[in-house]
A protein has these predicted regions:
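Soluble non-transmembrane domains of integral membrane proteins
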Residues: 1-240
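Helix-loop-helix
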Residues: 98, 111-112, 117-131, 194-198, ...
């Protein structure tokens, strides 16, 4: 149980990653040492029985590390294996240490393995449920490439490859269980599918322990929220499980900026506002070009209306007359599009940062918004957003096409209804961005109209 992460804010029931007993989806992480093929002697697999020295282990006050040793002994071979889980305060990384002591008369061999066995629950994607947008399923990293796996594909072509310096993971929105094998030798990565259940395994090379010798094997687990600072330290590029999709290259630095803003403000909501303003400032030269084009089009509004009235029955002549007007006034009606297109990947990347980052989960902002990852309970932000979009529409030139003009009129209402079910952090970002755009466009319109009046 992740006791610091309630399933529902304000309730005591925590998020539970693994499940083997209830009626919910089966999900376990298994570790052990397996014997050579054909060897019928006992080995400490995940099915073996281990003994604990105490019925309960607690992290003592003033201590930052808790070691939980479990012991397996095979009288026939004279081998004792101590399997120690090492927990650290405030960390979701778990170090796994095997100490193999061979007191027998013959060499003893075993290979370490770790595996994730999980039911694949198919979620029907819904625009009103952001949980369905995040990837949920198996993934691995081969030292170079990060790969998300589809269960249906693995059923047709099972995964089987040798990897050194990688990891495997079972992913879901905001949380992950990951296995990071020792990087000192290649491990065999496999995935098998039985119905809707998958088994993702990493198996190491066979290790031999001579009579009278003691050997130690070390592996790493990570079980918990996708806290990127901790993920980076737990395994090579393990922070990739904070999955921003194809916009990762842009999203990573944006998340870093958001973290720095949070260090200043101590509040993720104010951090969103601060970074939104920073992005607006960075892109001001580009958005100013777009704004100037729209402002000039707005000034020409009455003249365009006259042309529409004059050539209302001849669309060909209307188009020609409008192009001549644009040429005389040195206006390119498409000039404002390119700056917007250039900015879109950055804003979509920021969207994914807010959607995927566990730091936003149940993070409070203001009085009525106590969870930036959930919808606004009173729909205040969507209403403000709709009002801001309407003001923005009024600042822009009226479309020549009456149908298009009506579409733009009702767009704020449509967007507010849609965003009413989105996480309030996303709505906050969009609302602040719209309000900053209004301020910028109003200032540009004022300057363009003042310059026009001076010439007239």
């Amino acid at each position: 149980d992740l006791v610091n992460y309630p399933l529902v804010k304000g309730e005591s029931r925590p998020v539970r990653l693994f499940n083997r007993d209830s009626n919910e989806a089966f999900y376990v992480l298994q570790t052990g040492l397996a014997g050579p093929a054909g060897d019928s002697s006992a080995h400490p697999t995940h099915l073996a029985t281990f003994a604990a020295d105490a019925p309960r282990y607690d992290l003592a006050n003033g201590s930052d590390e808790l070691r939980v040793p479990l012991t397996w002994t095979d009288a026939a071979s004279g081998v004792t294996v101590t399997k120690t889980f090492i927990f650290r305060r405030g960390q979701y990384r778990i170090d796994l240490e095997y100490t193999v002591k061979n007191a027998g008369a013959a060499p003893w061999s075993a290979a370490p393995y770790m595996q994730i066995l999980r039911d694949d629950v198919v979620l029907e994607r819904s625009m009103f449920n952001v949980e369905t947008y995040a990837f949920k399923g198996p993934a691995y990293f081969d030292g170079t490439k990060y790969q998300k796996l589809k269960v249906e594909d693995a059923a047709k072509e099972p995964l089987a490859r040798d990897v050194q310096g990688g990891w495997i993971a079972g992913m879901q929105h905001h949380f992950v269980s990951a296995v990071v094998p020792s990087g000192d030798a290649p491990y065999r990565y496999t995935m098998k599918v039985d119905g809707r259940q998958y088994l993702l395994t990493t198996a190491g090379p066979m290790r031999s322990v001579a009579p009278g010798a003691t050997e130690t094997l070390k592996e790493t687990l990570f079980v918990g929220p996708k806290l990127q600072a901790q993920l980076e330290k737990a395994g090579p590029e393990l922070d990739r499980v904070a999955d921003y999709g194809k916009l990762t290259l842009l999203a990573k630095p944006l998340f870093w900026l958001l973290e720095q803003a949070h260090k200043l403000t101590g509040n993720w909501g104010w951090s969103i506002i601060l970074i939104t303003a920073l992005l607006k400032l960075i892109f001001y030269p580009l958005s100013e070009a777009s704004g100037k084009s729209m402002a000039k089009m707005r000034v020409l509004g009455p003249r365009i209306k006259n042309l529409q009235d004059t050539y209302k029955d001849d669309r060909e002549k209307l188009g020609k007359a409008m192009m001549e007007l644009y040429q005389r006034e040195k206006i390119n009606p498409l000039a404002g599009c390119l700056p917007i297109v250039i900015q879109m990947p950055v804003f979509f990347a920021f969207y994914w940062v807010l959607l995927e980052s566990v730091e936003m989960r149940q993070a409070p902002f203001l009085a009525w918004i106590q969870d930036l990852s959930s919808k606004d309970p009173f729909f205040v932000l969507p209403i403000i957003m709709a009002g801001a979009m309407f003001v923005q529409y009024k600042l822009n030139p009226t479309p020549a096409d009456p149908v298009q003009a009506k579409v733009f009129m009702i767009l704020p209402l449509v967007m507010s209804v849609t965003f009413a079910f989105f996480p309030s952090g996303l709505v906050l970002y969009y609302t602040v961005n719209t309000m900053l755009t209004i301020a910028q466009q109003w200032n540009i319109n004022r300057r363009i109209e003042a310059g026009r009046t001076g010439r007239d």
